[in-house]
Amino acid sequence: HALHPETPMHFFWDKQDADEVTKVDATLSFHQIDDVKFLNRMAGCRAYASTAGFESICEAMYLSKPVLMVPAHIEQDCNAYDARQAGAGIIGESFDLESLLRFAGTYVPNREFIRWVRSCERQIIGELERLADQHSAVTVPTLTNYFPI
């Protein structure tokens, strides 16, 4: 933050005794975790930095936001690797705002991912209809169900 004081930064945390919003200065704020507020902030941001949690990286990809991922454990390492392969962003050893801003300048969103997400309702309904068709055939009970042989 000290190197880029002009860049607004919003962080979300679950600090027990903190206010709803802790404003450090004009461009640095900490917010209590709130799903709706988080997504609204992400929708309006220029770029996103994360420890590479699966959901937030997918949300950033859907919203066409470049991502800096700094994984903290093995599951996040795997998420970061997959996300980088999908074009979501870059992986760093630390939260380096300069790297994120530089990447944001060249970022190209993965439009195929967005199309895939938007197709999920159609795919799910199609699969449910296919399964319903398989199970809707009339079965006629055999006599062995009623009389022991």
Question: Whereabouts are the PLM-identified features?
Answer:
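Nucleotide-sugar donor-binding patch of glycosyltransferase catalytic domains
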Residues: P66-V108
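Short acidic active-site motifs
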Residues: V36-F38, S99, Q123
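Donor-nucleotide binding loops and adjacent catalytic segments primarily
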Residues: H1-A47
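Short amphipathic alpha-helical segments and helix-helix/interface helices
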Residues: H1-A2, L39, A80, I125-L128
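C-terminal amphipathic helix plus adjacent low-complexity
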Residues: R102-I149
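Anion (oxyanion) recognition and catalysis
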Residues: L3-P5, M61, R84
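A donor-sugar binding/catalytic signature common to diverse glycosyltransferases
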Residues: K37-N79
